[in-house]
Amino acid sequence: MSALPIATNHYFDTHFDRPGVKLLPNEFYTTSEDIVLMTVLGSCVAACLHDPVSGIGGMNHFMLPDDGADAGAAASESMRYGAYAMEVLINELIKAGGRRERFEAKVFGGAAVLAGMTTINIGDRNADFVRRYLALERIRITAEDLQGVHPRKVAFMPRTGRAMVKKLRLQVPGVAEREAALAREAVRASAARARAKVELFAAPRPSAPPPARPRIELFGARSGGAGVQPAVQKAASPYAANLSRK
């Protein structure tokens, strides 16, 4: 298998006044440095894991849940699937000194960005998957902002576990095109599974745990673009929400 798709887009974030790394779909990043990890999500999901004792944290960005991953595929292709993306993130954090039993999770994304795509439900499937996966791994979700119809911009500070989210306008350049491609991929994967005609015998999947109810603070964005306030809690500012550790 090829090298793991670690995010390489480094920059300096003027809003948070610290170095940052931008994650694209299928990428991940882990570190104990005082930086910010940033990504933009539609139906995709980003899981942010943090060990509050060691100060190590990381983020991934996956596009589809646990369907269709090929054990012989390149790592960059496998990372699009949640099962592989979560396994990589957890394992890399453990390699860096984190302890699984201390991990805390904050999860974002899973929006229904494309109108009329209710039959595929990529966002709902991704949201349900990440909740079930973390429940099975006994990793507590301390905050979440999942589903809905708006794309999100997520910032995560891996050293402290602080996470912030901003709801974006429905029509964000590049997001709609990516969502359309995801819908085509989901249809292709479904057709491939039907052709395989493999019957699996397994225990019923556990239902997803109830959504986390985090405390949310809001912060302003320098860009000045109006965001949509999360439905979890009303707040004064119309910008991004701070999902703090406590």
Curated annotation (Swiss-Prot):
Keywords: Chemotaxis, Hydrolase. GO terms for biological process: chemotaxis. Residues 225-246 are annotated as: Disordered. One of its GO terms (molecular function) is protein-glutamine glutaminase activity. It holds the Pfam family CheD. The keyword NADP does not apply. It catalyses: L-glutaminyl-[protein] + H2O = L-glutamyl-[protein] + NH4(+). The keyword tRNA-binding does not apply. Its EC number is 3.5.1.44. Probably deamidates glutamine residues to glutamate on methyl-accepting chemotaxis receptors (MCPs), playing an important role in chemotaxis. Belongs to the CheD family. HAMAP family: CheD. This is Probable chemoreceptor glutamine deamidase CheD. It comes from Burkholderia vietnamiensis (strain G4 / LMG 22486) (Burkholderia cepacia (strain R1808)). The gene is cheD.
